[in-house]
């Protein structure tokens, strides 16, 4: 059977755990979504998609260089013991789960996680030349790379998951 699955948007909950460094303040304006589109469970190819997101930072006084670590938290829908190394989207009408993964740098590269439970954080040097409450906008990493492995035996439907992005000094 050739079941095409409408993969719901994977929402990366950007309730960013704000940076707690003395005078540095960072936020994630808006949300980030990763839409895998239709999934063909008979295909022998991975389903790969990517997206970027931006972070806004300001500092009092401005003009400093900082290094931030960006962590992606565990899957809220995974039933695995390690919800980072085994992320799962859940069917919105039944108990089916579809395994996927998020990477930094490239598809199938380093798992983007929290550096504690699993995966690695992404570190980025920034220059904050804007005094608070203004902001300097920069792009964190070039992309989040998402991959669904081929030939997963799941029912047709809409699948979704959410996780939290944390920005750490």
Regions from the PLM with identified roles:
Residues 21-95, 128-169:
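N-terminal small/polar-rich segments of proteins
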Residues 2-10, 21:
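Sec-dependent signal peptide recognition
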Residues 105-135:
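Extended, solvent-exposed segments with strong compositional bias
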Residues 15-20:
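N-terminal signal peptide c-region/cleavage motif recognized by signal peptidases
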Residues 71-75, 101-105, 113-115:
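Predominantly extracellular/luminal cell-surface or secreted proteins
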């Amino acid at each position: 059977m050739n079941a095409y699955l409408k993969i719901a948007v994977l929402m990366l909950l950007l309730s960013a755990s704000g940076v707690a460094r003395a005078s540095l303040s960072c936020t994630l304006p808006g949300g980030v979504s990763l839409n895998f589109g239709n999934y063909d469970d008979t295909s022998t190819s991975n389903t790969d998609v990517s997206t970027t997101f931006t972070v806004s930072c300001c500092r009092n006084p401005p003009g400093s260089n900082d290094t931030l670590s960006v962590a992606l938290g565990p899957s809220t829908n995974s039933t695995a013991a390690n919800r980072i190394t085994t992320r799962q989207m859940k069917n919105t009408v039944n108990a089916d789960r579809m395994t996927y993964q998020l990477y930094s740098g490239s598809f199938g590269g380093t798992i983007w996680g929290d550096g504690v439970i699993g995966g690695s954080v992404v570190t980025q040097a920034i220059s904050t030349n804007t005094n608070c409450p203004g902001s300097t906008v920069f792009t964190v990493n070039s992309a989040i790379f998402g991959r669904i492995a081929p030939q997963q035996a799941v029912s047709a439907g809409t699948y979704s998951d959410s996780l939290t992005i944390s920005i750490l000094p």
